[in-house]
From Swiss-Prot:
Residue stretches of biased makeup (Polar residues): 77-90, 393-402
Paired cysteines (S-S): none
Protein name, per record: Protein FAM221B
Transmembrane segments: none
Pfam families, per the entry: FAM221
PANTHER family attached to this UniProt entry: PROTEIN FAM221A-RELATED, PROTEIN FAM221B
Family indicated by similarity: Belongs to the FAM221 family.
UniProt feature coiled coil, ranges: none
Basic and acidic residues bias spans: 1-35
Region spans: Disordered: 1-205, 378-402
This protein's encoding gene: FAM221B
Organism field: Homo sapiens
InterPro entries: Fam221a/b
């Protein structure tokens, strides 16, 4: 009979594999704890377990195999409550110090399939080894789990606990991969956010100049020509200032309320009548008539004769520009020589209805129109009375090195 039961065990295990139980691992752990305690109590008495196993419903007959496979929980609960030693799982038999274990208890119930799936030949081999090592120290439940999991093939780990462990390990690997990707992305953004380090460029702050260095900049731009151009532009100013110191007569062109002169008038300065200052006779500060015959000019009236005096510095760069032919013009497009020298300076051009001279340029010193300026012949006393510069103060600016 025992041999017949042993032969029928593979069928039982195959049916158990086809119908795995759906029991919680937590309930199984509680059952194992009760089972281990139940085995430790009767260990002192060597009472045989055969009469109990005959009454146990866990050893199925061939006719009861499909019923037990579908309802493992119904048979398990009464067996634990009535006979606690009737559930001889493989792990519990290892923990108990029983010397003689019958072969009838080698049949694995359906609830043990959650932890391990073994064939009938493996169970026989392990039973023999358990009988030989019955006097040795029993293994712990955790060590048995580890040894069994190493010996089993991968396809036998079909329990819910193994699936949970596999799922947790996969999730951890995925999270680690995402963390590594995030670190790589942050490194790439850090490198792209600093293109200056990749290209070797350096950023330097820009500060405004503490003092203007126009003369030095002009020298660097024009080099040797700078001194000649400046001397030509201001030579008349220098000569007029030195002549005023010698004679005591300061001739200037300015707006009436100004304390400084926009231009100093010298011998090469031109009058509105078209003649130079040296062609006029200075009688008093209010009488400077023209000496040229048939000229009706009774008072010298300054008019710019160079494009630099009206701020048109670019005209000299033109190839067809003639400095001697340049004349200041009115808004009527006629020059000052085509207007009357006296009075409001009406236009004398045939067909022009211009009643007075209105300049189409501005003063390079004050940005005001020509008609807003006047020509003054001042003595040293009148300059002192008006608080305007006199003596060497008028030439102090020209002694600075260029």
């Amino acid at each position: 009979m025992e041999a017949h039961e042993i032969i029928e065990e593979p069928h039982i295990t195959m049916d158990a594999e086809k119908h795995p139980p759906s029991k919680d691992p937590s309930a199984e752990d509680l059952q194992e704890n009760h089972i281990s305690e139940s085995f430790l109590k009767p260990s002192t008495s060597e009472t045989p377990l055969e009469p109990h196993t005959s009454e146990s419903p866990l050893v199925p007959s061939p006719s009861q195999i499909p019923l037990e496979a579908h309802s493992p929980e119904t048979h398990q609960e009464p067996s634990i409550s009535e006979t606690p030693s009737e559930t001889p799982t493989y792990e519990a038999s290892l923990d108990s110090p029983i010397s003689v274990v019958p072969e009838k208890h080698l049949t694995l119930p359906p609830q043990s399939r959650d932890y391990v799936c073994l064939s009938s030949s493996d169970t026989l081999k392990e039973d023999l080894s358990s009988e030989s090592s019955s006097n040795e120290v029993p293994w712990t439940r955790r060590s048995t789990h580890l040894s069994e999991s190493e010996s089993l093939p991968e396809h036998c780990l079909s329990g819910p606990s193994s699936q949970v462990q596999v799922d947790t390990t996969e999730k951890q690997e995925e999270e680690a991969g995402e963390v590594e990707k995030g670190v790589d992305a942050s490194d790439s953004t850090a490198h792209t956010a600093q293109p200056g380090h990749q290209l070797g460029n350096t950023a330097r702050p820009v500060f405004p100049a503490r003092q203007t260095e126009l003369v030095e900049v002009a020298k660097a731009m024009h080099r040797e020509e700078f001194g000649a151009q400046v001397n030509n532009l201001f030579q008349w100013e220098k000569d007029a200032a030195l002549n005023a110191i010698q004679t005591g007569l300061y001739i200037g062109w300015r707006c009436p309320h100004y304390l400084w002169d926009c231009f100093r008038i010298g011998d090469e300065s031109r009058c509105f009548c078209g003649h130079l200052l040296r062609e006029h006779r200075i009688i008093s500060d209010i009488s400077v008539p023209c000496k040229v015959s048939q000229c009706r000019c009774f008072m010298f009236c300054f008019i710019p004769s160079r494009p630099e005096e009206v701020g048109e510095f670019w005209l000299k760069r033109r190839a067809t520009f003639d400095p001697k032919a340049w004349r200041a013009q009115c808004r009527c497009k006629h020059s000052h020589e085509e207007h009357a020298a006296t009075g409001p300076h009406p236009c004398r051009h045939h067909g022009c209805c211009c009643g007075c001279f209105e300049s189409n340029f501005l003063c390079a010193a004050c940005d005001r129109r020509w008609e807003e300026h006047e020509t003054f012949f001042d003595t040293q006393k009148t300059r002192q009375r008006g608080g305007r510069p006199r003596g060497t103060d008028t030439v102090s600016n020209w002694h600075r090195p260029l």
